[in-house]
Amino acid sequence: MQGKLHFPCNEENLKPDFVPEVGINISYALPDAKNFDDVCGIDGRIVKIGGKVKRMGDIDFGKSKHVARIVLTAMKFDPGMRSAMNIRYSENTVKKAKRKKLSIGFFDRKHEPKNVSTMEWGSKTVIEKLGFVPDIIYDKGGFGKEAMIRIIGKSPEDVVGKLKALL
């Protein structure tokens, strides 16, 4: 299935400090999504260029496998949680999320099995431990792996609303 979707992400919603080295992506799945082709994302990333936040790439289905894995995993536990976004990890952002009463889960990459998708394994590990899909899943990175915060919600608007709470 092919299609287009507008995501409510722009420079007003994103501070350059939130953009990780790998860039940001945001995804939104169709109801009953089963695979990457059922998940809309950016064919590229949201990146920081010259201190400004820019979207590099079109928005379409089947494009962001990295963040789509988070969405598809979350939907196995709660079909209503159909959107996710990754942002740069910072301890201050996690503290602010706690102050804003967002639900938070953490996984440690040191315990990650070999030959698995970090996004699937990490998301599943946190969700199973908590018993629900949290607003935030984060890790502190590892050798060659950037620390990351993932924001999960029912829609891109829900995810961006949670992001705005962290600004």
Enumerate the language-model features and the residues they cover.
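Conserved mixed alpha/beta catalytic, RNA-binding, or beta-rich assembly cores of soluble enzyme
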Residues: 1-167
